[in-house]
């Protein structure tokens, strides 16, 4: 009856098939089997990522189709239309959104933009690091009041001509000498070839009559004696270094001249050291 209904063409919707079963004493020779209902395909939920490649082998690619014909069993194809494949639209640039267009033409512009962003970020980080290091170093430096105490003001009118006076500056001995005209001419006439540490007398003074030196021997740090030695300047009693009136090493183991500190004349009779 089913085959007749299938072959009846336009009359198939109004035809119906009926059958009756009568219980008998004999058992059938062959047991009737009920065909198993095919299960719809199930997606593998163990896959951690959803992409076009991972879903291409599991989801049905064709739309929902139902086909029927004479002497042909009916078939149904299922299509999962609720699966959203990510396209990364929000993460791509406008130049590469079109998958059918080559991205080679815009590669230089995109690289330039990336380089620009990297350079700006690097400069910003370097500037921030520089400020942090500068503030850290400044926090360890001496404050303004400490620096003010590191300066000493000397009244030159208290030092007679030809004499040397010692002061204490930053924990070091400071020599201030008022030279005579003879001493000025004598030191200016010294040949630089005779000096171990060549330096002209005028390069060590701001006023020829005043010599300001740090009274520490450049050999091992002893304090020299003023108005002593073979050259009438300074003499170190520790190891016998002789300095002239300009503080230049002339004899002995000391390798360098006496150090000249920074100083400035505020008036004819006043000098500030430091």
UniProtKB/Swiss-Prot annotation:
Which part of the chain is the Rieske domain?
187-272
What does the record say about PTM? Answer: Proteolytic processing is necessary for the correct insertion of UQCRFS1 in the complex III dimer. Several fragments are generated during UQCRFS1 insertion, most probably due to the endogenous matrix-processing peptidase (MPP) activity of the 2 core protein subunits UQCRC1/QCR1 and UQCRC2/QCR2, which are homologous to the 2 mitochondrial-processing peptidase (MPP) subunits beta-MPP and alpha-MPP respectively. The action of the protease is also necessary for the clearance of the UQCRFS1 fragments.
Could you tell me which Gene3D superfamilies the record lists for this protein?
Answer: Cytochrome Bc1 Complex, Chain I, Rieske [2Fe-2S] iron-sulphur domain, Ubiquinol cytochrome reductase, transmembrane domain
Its EC number(s): 7.1.1.8
Membrane spanning segments where? Answer: 104-140
The note on the cofactor says: Binds 1 [2Fe-2S] cluster per subunit. Fe-S cluster delivery to the Rieske protein is mediated by components of the iron sulfur (Fe-S) cluster assembly machinery that reside in the mitochondrial matrix (including HSC20 and LYRM7).
A single GO cellular-component term from the record reads: mitochondrial inner membrane
Coding gene?
UQCRFS1
Q: What class of enzyme is it?
A: translocase
Residues bound to [2Fe-2S] cluster are 217, 219, 236, 239, 241
UniProt miscellaneous comment: The Rieske protein is a high potential 2Fe-2S protein.
Q: Which reaction does it catalyse?
A: a quinol + 2 Fe(III)-[cytochrome c](out) = a quinone + 2 Fe(II)-[cytochrome c](out) + 2 H(+)(out)
Mitochondrial matrix compartment residues: 79-103
Which family does the UniProt entry place this protein in? Belongs to the Rieske iron-sulfur protein family.
Q: Which cofactor does it need?
A: [2Fe-2S] cluster
Q: Which UniProt keywords apply?
A: 2Fe-2S, Disulfide bond, Electron transport, Iron, Iron-sulfur, Membrane, Metal-binding, Mitochondrion, Mitochondrion inner membrane, Respiratory chain, Transit peptide, Translocase, Transmembrane, Transmembrane helix, Transport
The topology of this chain with respect to the membrane is: Single-pass membrane protein
Cite the GO molecular-function annotations of the record. 2 iron, 2 sulfur cluster binding; metal ion binding; ubiquinol-cytochrome-c reductase activity
Q: Which residues lie on this side of the membrane: Mitochondrial intermembrane?
A: 141-274
Disulfide pairings: 222-238
Q: Where in the cell is it found?
A: Mitochondrion inner membrane
Q: Which GO terms describe its biological process?
A: respiratory electron transport chain
Query: What domain of life?
Result: Eukaryota
This chain's protein is named Cytochrome b-c1 complex subunit Rieske, mitochondrial
